Amino acid sequence: MLYLNQKPEYNKYDIGDYTYSKVGPTIFSWNDETKLKIGKFCSLAEEVVFILGGEHRADWITTYPFNALFDEGAHITGHPSSKGDIVVGNDVWIGYQSCILSGVTIGNGA
């Protein structure tokens, strides 16, 4: 068992005291704008994943990342995108293999 806010790899995230996991979550981040905040006394099961952005633009004519794969598309901005920060309240249990996407808020005690 490890307290996440005591592990250097999680220092850039806002993680409350006594939040723990057996192995720690996987966190994917495509920029420093989308934040992850996890409250105190949370329990994270194994293989939990937080995805901070990196989402395809379903509102565009294509979800293909032309700007990332072709020099001709380098001028296209807004892809990948984020729906906002991830906020997890206090005393929350996140179960095995859960995947939490950007823009999600989980309330206290969930």
Question: How does the language model describe each region?
Answer:
Residues 3, 20-104:
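Flexible, glycine/small-residue-enriched loop-and-beta-strand segment within the central core
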Residues 106-110:
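Short, intrinsically disordered, charge-balanced linker/junction segments flanking boundaries
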